[in-house]
Amino acid sequence: MNFQTSTCDLVERFKRGDQAAFSLLFGKYHRRLAVLVHYKMSEELRGRVEVDDILQDVFLAAAQGLGRFTYQNPGSFMAWLSRIANDTIVDAARHQNRKKRRAEELLRFRSESNPNGPEPIDFATPSRVFAQQESLQILLRNLDTLPAEYREVILLAKFEGLTTSEISEHLGKSRENVALTLHRALKRFREIQLKADRQ
């Protein structure tokens, strides 16, 4: 995948009917959103509902609503996905019958009864999926070793795409405090990643 392709370009291509553009968007944001969803779900909910189920529902909702999305800045798409993820997680907590919801969502794909629906997206081979899941598990373990304050600012900045000002407002702290905490958190996280890579 070409990471040089901008989110704005991919959104516009999808709006013009390029289904492959959505697959590229999915690939570009999958990992960030997976981490975000993991930490937004309660342990109890994660025990009953797979993060991947939530992600699939988020991306289905995004595909259906992307025509109404307006790109504003580099963080706006991730912020939009984050809002969809929040809604999806709340919905999952209220409704435990995941199979019924999945069937309803899948009916929207192209079929004999819906010939104009989008094609189901083939995201990856089984070996690629396994490698991505293993990589995601390592990332989550490394994030879990951080103090809660560090983990929170990293999630807000790098996975939700909030600016320092937005994080400051969200946490009720000064911009300088947030910037310093984020700097320290990222430094600590890099150290943890390097240590894990050596093992």
Label for each model-derived stretch:
Residues L33, P120-L155, L162, H170:
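Amphipathic alpha-helical segment used for protein-protein interaction
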Residues V49, D53-L60, G75-D87, L180:
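Structural recognition of an alpha-helix C-terminal capping motif at a helix-to-coil junction
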Residues R68, N86-L107, P118, Q132, ...:
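Arg/Lys-rich amphipathic alpha helix in sigma70-family domain 2
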Residues A34-V37, M41, N97, L146-R151, ...:
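Short, Lys/Arg-enriched C-terminal cap helix and immediately downstream tail that follows
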Residues R16-G27, V35-D57, S174-R175, R198-Q199:
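Short, charged helix-capping/linker segments at alpha-helix termini
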Residues E12-R16, Y39-R46, F59-P74, H95-N97:
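Sigma70-family region 2
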Residues L139-R141, Y150, F159, T164-A196:
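DNA-recognition helix of helix-turn-helix
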Residues M1-R31, G67, E119-F123, S127:
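N-terminal module of bacterial RNA polymerase sigma factors
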